[in-house]
């Protein structure tokens, strides 16, 4: 729990804040997450997405951010030794992966009490149930978009998951 309390001065929190952490590789789904962000921004939603990680797609993702005019919405922050302050500051943790094992970072978001939206890949339902403790969407681009749209447009849906993730956090412990 101490790691989440370390000071982090580069987290802008002037609007709904989404965070995603992972290697910038194709199976992690960051390209489709940026596509969803472009659609949501075009629809007038105010939010910010911080992506923490490094990898082979870094240049392509920077280009997609420029092409889709997302410079004021999406930031690639690179690798961070301690991602906890970013996750803890988030309004929503997003896991857009095509393929994922048991996700340590999703478990960490649960422990930190951060609502989660994830695509359905291995291990997610073990952590979140059938969308009981976090929104688990079909593993498709459109379902990811729809889930993000719901979290931004439906305060009752967001608040529901805000409460449920706190219930689920009681099953986990950071001290292990």
Language-model regions: role of each:
Residues 79, 98:
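Aromatic "clamp/platform" in nucleotide-sugar-dependent glycosyltransferases that forms part
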């Amino acid at each position: 729990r101490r790691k989440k309390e370390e000071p982090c001065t580069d987290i802008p929190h002037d609007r709904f804040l989404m965070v995603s952490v992972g290697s910038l590789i194709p199976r992690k789904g960051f390209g489709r997450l940026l596509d969803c962000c472009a659609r949501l921004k075009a629809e007038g939603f105010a939010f910010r997405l911080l992506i923490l990680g490094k990898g082979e797609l870094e240049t392509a993702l920077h280009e997609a951010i420029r092409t889709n005019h997302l410079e004021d919405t999406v930031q690639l922050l690179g690798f961070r030794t301690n991602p906890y302050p970013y996750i803890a500051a988030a309004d929503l943790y997003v896991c857009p992966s095509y393929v994922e094992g048991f996700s340590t970072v999703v478990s960490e978001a649960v422990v930190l009490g951060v609502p989660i939206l994830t695509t359905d890949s291995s291990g997610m339902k073990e952590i979140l149930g059938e969308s009981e403790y976090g929104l688990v969407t079909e593993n498709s681009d459109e379902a990811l978009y729809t889930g993000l749209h719901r979290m931004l447009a439906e305060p009752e849906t967001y608040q529901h998951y805000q409460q449920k993730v706190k219930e689920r956090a009681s099953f986990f412990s950071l001290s292990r």
